[in-house]
Amino acid sequence: MGRALLLTLLAALAAAPLAAVWGISHAQVDDYLGPHRVRFASNFRGEVELNLGPIGNAYLASPVRPIGLSLTVGGVGSASENPDSLFSEQTLIAYTSLYTEPGEVLSGIVEGLVRDAVREGLKAEAVLLLGVALWRLRRRLVAPWIVTTVTRRRAAAVYVAVVALVVGSILVPPKPTDPRHPVSIAEGGQFSSLTVDSLLLANVLDRGIKGIKLLSARQQRAVKTYLDSATGSLSSQLGDLPKPGSGETMILGFSDLHCNRAMAELISRLAHATQPSIVLSSGDDTVNGTAAERGCIRREAAIPDEVPFLVATGNHDSDLTEAQMRTVGMTVLDGQVIDAAGLNVLGDDDPEHNIPFSVDRVKERPESEEEMAQRLVDVARNRHTDVLLVHQPVAARVIMDSPNLPVPLVLWGHYHAESGPAVIMHNDGSWTVGMQQGTAGGVHEPMITSFSTPFSPPLISADVYFYFRDDTTGLITGVQPVHFRPDATVVIEDRIATGDLAKLPLETRIKLGGASATPTVEASR
């Protein structure tokens, strides 16, 4: 038994180099860069190759030679595409992040390629081990003359020759035979080694990169100016910032951030100044839910000051977005009640997802918004729930219309417009507060025309909300919105009272955990 295990381990080690080569050379990921669908595939050609179809190919030295990367862009140069769209401001803006922070944008793609390479490598390892096992059984499976011919020494020699051939071809990749033309505008920058095999593409990229550089500089200046001005406005009102009263828990909530970099930073500064107990997002944290938006999720995850961050993802997010969120420590709600910061939070992701860079939606599961809402209500009736998060108002309407809903706070977004707080009174004198949160990213609708969202200041009011929960009864006694205007002024609204605890019936107060009347908490201003 011990000898068999040792032989298996030796076979696995011998097969590992070939399996690794197979895995790397066969890994691929389909995702988006800008508005175009792209297939990413790793190889050993030692360069990054961008295949733009009939327009030509672009080449860039790989930073991890001899491993290279092939990007095949779909739709470019097709008859259905307007050629002018290649130079439109919207398209250039969509690629700005690739120019300004290529490492951040591509890191999500690379993670996917690594996972696929591991999967392909494990498959190859299994096949090679099967081959070794069959070789060990060769005396039972093949003719004696073959056994005599294929000796261990000859098999080892073949293995060494194959490994040497493979390693040699990797370390000394073939030299390109096609013509290469430098792109002049890339000289001296991070794309200084960029070349193309088409004069047409050289002209396209000269124009495109020049446009991206101008747009990038303009947007970065605008974002910095907005950050500085909004921070100054916020700092001048430190005494008016939301803060909980005695016996209260303060919750920070927002929706539809849509990857806005300026607002992610400002909300982080606001959270640091106010110290909420928990942060909640009702979805649409990204623009398209692509791997390239990994940096957006990383920045958003830094918003809370070491407190729980829970999300009910929206129709612009994706399964990949949810995986990115979990990786950086955010909690993605999935229909189960989660205990966080002493609160029971319930929610689920949107059953509909947008196709990237499109207004079209596809169903991710056979469930309507209304059916999801009713399912969550049923869960809340059987498990104590303090907060219920969904993304779309269609679902929220079903929840808020449920008689005597046993949930003190319901939050949603999607419309990029604030509505509420709505207070629904129940038969026992308690209440539910519902809030349609605006857009924390200050984003115009429809999203299809807002490619610049991650790199621009808010285009409309960017909204953040603070909710005040009475620790004794669990009821929400107030809501305080904070608005970041497009002109960088910050408006801290007065606290809006949502219920009077002194009027709560004694039997309800006892049921909720308060044995005696609790005085109304006045707004702390």
Regions found by a protein language model. Give the residues of each.
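Beta-strand-turn-beta hairpins that frame and shape the catalytic cleft
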Residues: 199-210, 242-251, 336-347, 352, ...
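His/acidic metal-ligating clusters that form di-metal
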Residues: 272-274, 341-346, 352-431
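Conserved beta-sheet core of the metallophosphoesterase superfamily
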Residues: 301-303, 307-310, 392-521
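Non-catalytic terminal accessory segments
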Residues: 1-237, 504-525
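Acidic/histidine-rich helix-loop elements
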Residues: 211-223, 248-263, 286-291, 354-367, ...
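Core catalytic region of metal-dependent phosphoesterases/phosphodiesterases
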Residues: 146, 241, 254, 259-339
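Extracytosolic and intramembrane catalytic regions of membrane-associated proteins
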Residues: 225-245, 257, 265-274, 323-326, ...
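Active-site metal-binding loops of divalent metal-dependent hydrolases
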Residues: 255-258, 283-285, 315-316, 349-351, ...
